[in-house]
């Protein structure tokens, strides 16, 4: 006679069921959106000569168009993250991806400096909420020990998306105009939005493909609901202020790699390379940076187990990253051969991006239910650095007669400032814990 399952045995049999792996689809969606975001963001840099020629734009006007994106991106970081905390990342990501994809396509129809400036500003306003809301989704869908790895993988592909945008843009421009190229890039967003809308839910338990064993593995992450942001706690938290400061100091040198680096490589007072060689070497920081993000994602959980504390492991990795970035940058100045100098600068970027997953992972752990707001405010500081750094760099070069060493020494010093922040950041205490108890690993 067959045994009937009793109420006591049914839960045991259910808990022994192998966990599904649906949570990893969140990482897949994050990676593809990060690549798409960087393609849409960087494409204009490589189409700029054609745009300037067609619209009759001066260098200063083209520079202002670049700044329009950075300014909007910085201004709308906190609202984008706050909306994710209030409404959930699903609704926000769907809306902002449609928004920025539309304005990517609209870029191809602009006819003047003013219209292009407005289009790129509105594009930046939409894309600003991307990474804070992906971080919010990670907070809800991933167990604590997998979050930094997910950030590392996401930022690796984001960097590599930027690195491979130049050949992609050149390929598209080989069979169409710059105007239709932006329409094509904008259309890619519709594919992502459709797939994401069909699969993603704010809470794992609302996705029928996630079984009970995986829900148990995810743990209390899935309970992160929406609520009023505790602005008082946010402003009074030392860790929050230091996360803001370290990200500004991390982003300031990084923007050299994606703004002034090609000019440095071609300048007679820099490396004096041809335009072709400069284009080849300029991708090194993006390529090496991607490996840095991946490395941090792979080693972070091991460091957590080795130290027994996410607070200590994040501090060790981040301090090492800042110190290495400063040291390799100084080393690159001492090397005469351009190839090996760029390898050293690539290692500075590698070290730079060791910090990235730790910073975003700490936003998830410190922010808790309010990870969207915290990560948005942190990323705002990074983009303010992106607004300031090119301006300061231009002033230094103009004041010193293109003395690039002054600029590079300043960047190395800025990295040292970031290293000083991390020993005082506590990644183990969440803002949404009323009793401020350290969060379990």
Describe each region flagged by the PLM.
Residues 154, 158-207:
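Helix-loop-helix hairpin linking two adjacent transmembrane segments in secondary transporters
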Residues 174-187, 275, 313-316, 395-414:
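A membrane-interface helix-boundary motif in multi-pass transporters
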Residues 44-45, 237-296, 355-360, 389-390:
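Extracytoplasmic gate region of multi-pass secondary transporters
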Residues 75-114:
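Conserved MFS/SLC helix-loop-helix module at the cytosolic interface between two early adjacent transmembrane helices
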Residues 119-158:
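Cytoplasmic helix-loop-helix junction between adjacent transmembrane helices
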Residues 25-59, 257-262:
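Extracytoplasmic
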Residues 56, 88, 109-115, 126, ...:
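Helix-breaking motifs and short loop linkers at transmembrane-helix boundaries and internal kinks
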Residues 98-111, 319-336:
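C-terminal ends and interior cores of transmembrane alpha-helices
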